[in-house]
Swiss-Prot record:
Asparaginase/glutaminase domain sequence ranges: 92-422
Highest rank taxon of the organism: Archaea
Protein name in the entry: Glutamyl-tRNA(Gln) amidotransferase subunit D
Membrane-spanning parts: none
Organism: Pyrococcus furiosus (strain ATCC 43587 / DSM 3638 / JCM 8422 / Vc1)
Record-annotated active site: 102, 178-179, 256
InterPro entries: AsnA_fam, Asp/glu_Ase-like_sf, Asparaginase/glutaminase-like, Asparaginase/glutaminase_AS1, Asparaginase/glutaminase_AS2, Asparaginase_C, GatD, GatD_N
Reaction(s) catalysed by this chain's protein: L-glutamyl-tRNA(Gln) + L-glutamine + ATP + H2O = L-glutaminyl-tRNA(Gln) + L-glutamate + ADP + phosphate + H(+)
Gene Ontology MF terms: asparaginase activity; ATP binding; glutaminyl-tRNA synthase (glutamine-hydrolyzing) activity
Pfam family, one: GatD_N
Subunit organization: Heterodimer of GatD and GatE.
Disulfide bonds: none
Length: 438
């Protein structure tokens, strides 16, 4: 029996507060919570309720011995806040751009449902603390999961960001899903030229309906960083699992390193720019960050989308490289093993790619450390084949950078020169011991 039919027979509607008695291994277990809408991808035979602690559980219909309504759902029209507050002259003004993701979610407490369509306006209204930091101009660009983000979205975000910065805003906060936030941060780092004010990407590992949500604190800290002196593209997220402080990471050196921890984001081969406390304290951890200044920000949005990111693995077939070349790809970023190696039998296909005008770049799947193709014979053969070693760049950053580079040149010598030029802090001069696993 499907859940819709089951609930209808029992006279139960989504949003009702119910008590369920379930039989598990001969024992009765009791749950109370709000009936949720059926999940789109569920089998349709499970009743989902939101417990009082905020978490959802699913109970198979066949295991439900008894289900009773404790309180009927209260019909209530949905409210959309516009966050139209009188500007305060003593506060700076920033723009919050909404793009989607976990931070852009809200709970309807009458039905228990969690909606991903939490607009930037509603998000701002839900965290009133940010109005004590700055005047907020919220704007929803789109509402998509970050895994659906494409280069065209990066370009739109870049233009909207530059527009906001050039129209009197002191900074921009971008609400973004966490899964591909590093890619977007890197793309903005290369596309936003002459950056004179802060651009801060922020997200949440846990949605706003969960007791352990990091959404509010992350947004508060991001807003504080957006009115700071650091004129860089940054990612601001929790610095540790508790609600102690957030960290501001440089946009080209940051990576999501855990699927679910609140402090999942880490600076790789670099130290963060700053620690931020929600009460307003900011501790800069380095002094070489780009400082706030005057001048117009402009967007360099030329991107070559026919670029691939390929991870090397034992037994990898050279046919994969050949396929990309045959399909007209202009660039390939390889995540090599160790210092930047591939199986030896890939080298002829890599050389063919370079000979046919494809830019082939090498990063390391170790993430930490630096590519060095001069140490072992395989690396030297790759160099001879024309592979560009990408120093200590993250694979994702190198992928985005190569798209940007090939948007400007088809000449492999010029492409190599540009890939090895440090435009946005993506390359550090040398590897510091204190940047490993921080």
């Amino acid at each position: 029996m499907r859940v819709e039919e089951f609930l209808k027979q029992k006279g139960i509607e989504v949003g009702d507060y119910v008590r369920i008695i379930k039989v598990e291994d001969g024992e009765k277990v009791e749950y109370e919570g709000i009936v949720m809408p059926p999940y789109e991808l569920s089998e349709g035979d499970t009743v989902v309720i939101k417990l009082d602690n905020g978490y959802n559980i699913g109970i198979a219909i066949e295991k439900i011995q008894e289900i009773n309504v404790i309180e009927k759902a209260k019909a209530k029209p949905e409210v959309h806040f516009k966050a139209e507050l009188e500007p305060r002259k003593e506060l700076p003004t920033i723009t919050i751009l909404g793009t989607g993701g976990t931070i852009a979610s809200r709970i309807d407490y009458e039905t228990g449902a969690v909606y991903p369509a939490f607009t930037a306006e509603e998000l701002a209204k839900a965290v009133p603390e940010i109005f004590e930091i700055a005047n907020i101009k919220p704007k929803l660009l789109f509402n998509i999961f970050s895994e659906d983000m494409k280069p065209k979205h990066w370009i739109e975000i870049a233009h909207e960001t530059a527009k906001a910065l050039n129209s009197g805003n002191e900074g921009v906060v971008i609400a973004h899903g966490t899964d591909t936030m590093g890619y977007t941060a890197a793309a903005l780092s290369f596309m936003l030229r002459n950056l004179t004010k802060p651009v801060v990407l922020v997200g949440a590992q846990r949605s706003s309906d969960r007791p352990s949500s990091d959404a509010a604190m992350n947004l508060i800290c991001a807003t504080r960083m957006a009115v700071s002196d650091a004129a860089e593209v940054m990612v601001v997220m929790h610095g540790e699992t508790s609600d102690t402080y957030c960290l501001a990471h440089r946009g080209t050196k940051v990576r999501k390193m855990h699927t679910s921890r609140r402090d999942a984001f880490r600076s790789i081969n670099d130290i963060p720019i700053a620690k931020i406390w929600s009460d307003g304290k900011i501790e800069f951890l380095r002094d070489d960050y780009r400082k706030r200044s005057e001048g117009e920000v402009w967007v360099d949005d030329k991107l070559e989308e026919k670029v691939a990111l390929v991870k090397v693995y034992p037994g990898m077939s050279a046919e994969l490289i050949d396929f990309l070349v045959d399909k007209g790809y202009k660039g390939i970023v390889i995540e090599g093993t160790g210092l930047g190696h591939t199986p030896s039998d890939l080298i002829p296909s890599i050389k063919r790619a370079v000979d046919e005008g494809v830019a082939v770049c090498m990063t390391s799947q170790c993430l930490y450390g630096r590519v060095n193709l001069n140490v072992y014979a395989t690396g030297r053969k790759l160099l001879k084949a024309g592979v560009i070693p990408c120093e200590d760049m993250l694979p994702e950053t190198a992928y985005v950078k190569l798209m940007w580079v090939l948007g400007h040149t088809n000449d492999l010598r010029e492409a190599k020169k540009m890939m090895l030029t440090n435009y946005a802090g993506e390359i550090t001069p040398y590897t510091k011991p204190n940047t490993f696993l921080i």
